Amino acid sequence: MSYKLKVKGQYIKDLSFENQNSPQIFVMISKTPPEINISVNVSSVSLPVKAQDQENGQSLDNKVEPLYEVTLQVNAEARVGTTVAFICEVKYCGVFSVENSDASNGEELSQQDMRDMLLISAPSILFPFVRELISRITATGGFPPLMLDVVDFKAMYESQIKQNAAEQNDNGQHTEK
């Protein structure tokens, strides 16, 4: 495959950190380590943008450069018993293009390869930035830095496909009595 995923930009789209039970929670976590629950989600949307003429900067109405926004959402919640220690929610996005590095071969990118690039490769590029961001936010919030484990986005994607197929089978096999 001669296609490359190119990062056009990346940014924080949404960020929230809640530490509503301070300062009492700091006494609680000094005695009992918090239980931390983490969820990770990935989504992508197409962002059609008109291509620009390189020489004069004018819009080329007949060409569209396909761009994609990939969102990596990570939610982390720490609890001591039933008391919330903190909630950290991050939506971190990247704008990507998929470019043919060998335009002479005329090879089309399959939908499956495109999904792999956008839902496996792109979040793998974004993840280190999200991991660092969450580590700094939790430390700034007065907690030990939360270091996220590496995420296997391929396994996550395959699991989601299996779950969707199972849900479709359940919906398709429903019979009325």
Curated annotation (Swiss-Prot):
Keyword Cytoplasm in annotation: yes
GO CC term, one of those recorded: cytoplasm
Keywords: Chaperone, Cytoplasm, Protein transport, Translocation, Transport
UniProt keyword Disulfide bond present: no
Spans through the membrane: none
GO molecular function: unfolded protein binding
Predominant location category: cytoplasm
Any one GO BP annotation for this protein: protein folding
Intracellular or extracellular location(s): Cytoplasm
SUPFAM superfamilies: SecB-like
Its biological purpose: One of the proteins required for the normal export of preproteins out of the cell cytoplasm. It is a molecular chaperone that binds to a subset of precursor proteins, maintaining them in a translocation-competent state. It also specifically binds to its receptor SecA.
Record-stated family: Belongs to the SecB family.
Subunit structure, interactors included: Homotetramer, a dimer of dimers. One homotetramer interacts with 1 SecA dimer.
Record-linked PANTHER family: PROTEIN-EXPORT PROTEIN SECB (PTHR36918:SF1), PTHR36918
UniProt protein name: Protein-export protein SecB
